[in-house]
From Swiss-Prot:
It comes from the Bacteria. Keywords: DNA-directed RNA polymerase, Nucleotidyltransferase, Transcription, Transferase. It is an enzyme of class 2 (transferase). Homodimer. The RNAP catalytic core consists of 2 alpha, 1 beta, 1 beta' and 1 omega subunit. When a sigma factor is associated with the core the holoenzyme is formed, which can initiate transcription. The gene is rpoA. The keyword Transcription applies. Residues 268-341 are annotated as: Alpha C-terminal domain (alpha-CTD). The N-terminal domain is essential for RNAP assembly and basal transcription, whereas the C-terminal domain is involved in interaction with transcriptional regulators and with upstream promoter elements. One of its GO terms (cellular component) is DNA-directed RNA polymerase complex. This is DNA-directed RNA polymerase subunit alpha. Residues 1-223 are annotated as: Alpha N-terminal domain (alpha-NTD). The keyword Nucleotidyltransferase applies. It catalyses: RNA(n) + a ribonucleoside 5'-triphosphate = RNA(n+1) + diphosphate. InterPro entries: DNA-dir_RNA_pol_insert, DNA-dir_RNA_pol_RpoA/D/Rpb3, DNA-dir_RpoA, RBP11-like, RNAP_asu_C, RNApol_insert_sf.
């Protein structure tokens, strides 16, 4: 019986999208869902803050008179800034604030070919005598780029910032059983996508499928390997191994020598796991700014260090409660990682 062609149904609500693909042949739910999820998490282009200049600040470990947040906290807040480009090329955002009160992202002066998606984001809190002047550079890119990779000398005392460009915040998928008529051994793929608002879930999914299609298209243009063809063509029937007639040399059967097992040195190497080689940085886990700051205050600055801790260890970290612990576990699980038992 001919299988029904799969159909895709979508439900998009702002920066959240749910996509259902069915019916699929048994096993194809995972075959399709896993690569799309990996591409969504790693390869969708987006924008991010790459450097910041703050007036009268020389380095990221400084404090600013009249500003409650130190420079590290300001940078963490700026990493949450979401900017949507309407034209290519880096953009410079300028902020000038003075006097008591909150400073929100809406206070930035933004070029006409860009917009801030989250204008209510709190950047800083100023005292009555506080003053904050800064320039923020926003660029386009893919995945995670460390600060040293895009350090710029365009502005003296500019502080480079490690950037997570992906507009996709989280991706989850699972496969269910489904049926069509009497055929019950079919898959239903359910894919859920959360974005930061600079790109919609449908747009991100379309881009992921385009990337996957381009990568697989190479298999449609296979070129012959002359060296391989010539070696096979030159082979005679006698040179081709035939298991029915092949025999070992007589010396193998007649030799009285036995292998010296005592000389063997068995030194097995541990098989590397995802825990040993994290695939993402601490910033790339998608943790909230508050949780990320609490971890870094305790010197937990890598995924490897985080995964070496247990639930009990993390509860001792100031600012980490049950809700924060659940958030950390959920974000680690998205990358196949977990805390120590």
């Amino acid at each position: 019986m001919e299988q029904k062609r799969p159909q895709l149904k979508a439900r998009v609500d702002g920066d959240y999208g749910e996509f259902v693909l069915e019916p699929l042949a048994r096993g194809y739910g995972v075959t399709i869902g896993n690569p799309i999820r990996r591409i969504l998490m790693s390869s969708i282009p987006g924008t991010a803050v790459t450097s910041v200049y703050i007036e009268d600040v020389l380095h990221e470990f400084s404090t600013i008179p009249g500003v409650r947040e130190d420079v590290i906290r300001l940078i963490l807040n700026l990493k949450e800034l979401v900017v949507k480009f309407h034209a290519p090329g880096p953009k410079t955002l300028t902020l000038r604030a003075q006097g008591e009160g909150e400073v929100r992202a809406s206070a930035f002066e933004v070029p006409t070919d860009a917009e801030i998606v989250n204008p209510d984001l709190v950047i800083a809190n100023l005292a009555e005598d506080g003053k904050l002047v800064m320039e923020v550079r926003v660029e386009e890119g893919e995945g995670y780029v460390s600060a040293d990779k895009h350090a710029t000398k365009d502005r003296i005392n500019s502080i480079p910032v490690d950037a997570m460009f992906s507009p996709v915040r989280r991706v989850a998928y699972h496969v269910e059983n489904t049926r069509v008529g009497q055929q019950t051994d079919l898959d239903r793929l359910i894919l859920r996508v959360w974005t930061d608002g600079s790109a919609g879930p449908q747009e991100a999914l379309d881009k992921a499928v385009e990337i996957l299609r381009d990568e697989l298209s190479v298999f449609g243009n296979v070129e012959p390997m002359p060296a391989l063809e010539s070696s096979y063509a030159a082979a005679t029937p006698a040179a081709v191994y035939d298991p029915a007639t092949a025999t070992l040399p007589a010396s193998v059967y007649d030799s009285p020598r036995q292998p010296d097992l005592g000389s063997l040195s068995i030194n097995p190497q541990p098989f590397p796991t995802d825990q040993d080689t994290p695939r993402v940085t601490l910033e790339g886990l998608g943790l909230t700014t508050r949780v990320l700051h609490s971890l870094k205050e305790e010197g937990i600055d890598s995924v490897d260090a985080l995964c070496a801790l247990s639930d009990r260890d993390l509860k001792k970290v100031p600012g980490i409660g049950e809700r924060s612990l659940d958030e950390i576990k959920q974000q680690l699980a998205q990358f196949g990682l977990a805390l120590r038992d």
